[in-house]
Amino acid sequence: LCRQIVLLKPKALILFEINELALYAIEKQLSNINTHYSFKIYPILGSVNNKKRLKNLFQSFNVDTVYHSAAYKHVPMVEFNTTEGIDNNIFGTLNCAASAIESGVKNFVLISTDKAVRPTNTMGATKRVAELILQAFSMNQNITTFCMVRFGNVLNSSGSVIPLFKKQIIEGGPVTVTDKKIIRYFMTVTEAVEL
């Protein structure tokens, strides 16, 4: 997502991430791309569960648009860690959206999932609740425009099943599938961020 935003030549790009290594890696990649452009990249460590930090960040940088993609998205992991999934995916979204309104952010885009449609697992349910939070905020204020996009299976993203399948094949199998009758649809990372 950030690599695509860079191509739009923003005034500044604020990267807000809880994972130090992930933040370091993306900041380095974007800094290399940014040699062709002239805008600032700010790598900021933090959690969407720290509302005070979010509000301060949005106000300090006069943020115009938020792309909220912070989520726990590995279905089995969220099933095993339900409380953390709820805390991050639901309350993190609530904090981020409320901070956006309080800070006068114009646009807020939630990155959601196709698993939020008639959810059958905790991760899908938490993302559906996150969508409902934005819908409620949209009806009760006119400061921030909220929208959301549901991604399906994104090839080679951090949540993709493809690396797991590759590993299982290299190791001689078996390839684990949840349901032999299921049909999976995939999109590339580029296709996903262009939505």
Enumerate the language-model features and the residues they cover.
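Aromatic pocket-lining residues of Rossmann-like dinucleotide-binding sites
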Residues: 4-5
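Proline-aspartate-enriched helix->loop->beta-strand connector
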Residues: 10-11, 58, 62-67, 75, ...
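Helix N-cap at the beta1-alpha1 junction of Rossmann-like dinucleotide-binding domains, i.e.
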Residues: 19-22
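NAD(P)-dependent short-chain dehydrogenase/reductase
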Residues: 31, 98-101, 122-195
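Conserved Rossmann-fold cofactor-binding substructure of NAD(P)-dependent oxidoreductases
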Residues: 42-65
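Hydrophobic/aromatic anchor residues within beta-strands of the central parallel beta-sheet
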Residues: 43, 85, 108, 146-149
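Conserved residues in the N-terminal Rossmann fold of short-chain dehydrogenase/reductase
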Residues: 44-45, 87, 179
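Conserved Rossmann-fold NAD(P)-dependent oxidoreductase catalytic core, especially the SDR/UDP-sugar
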Residues: 68, 72-131, 136
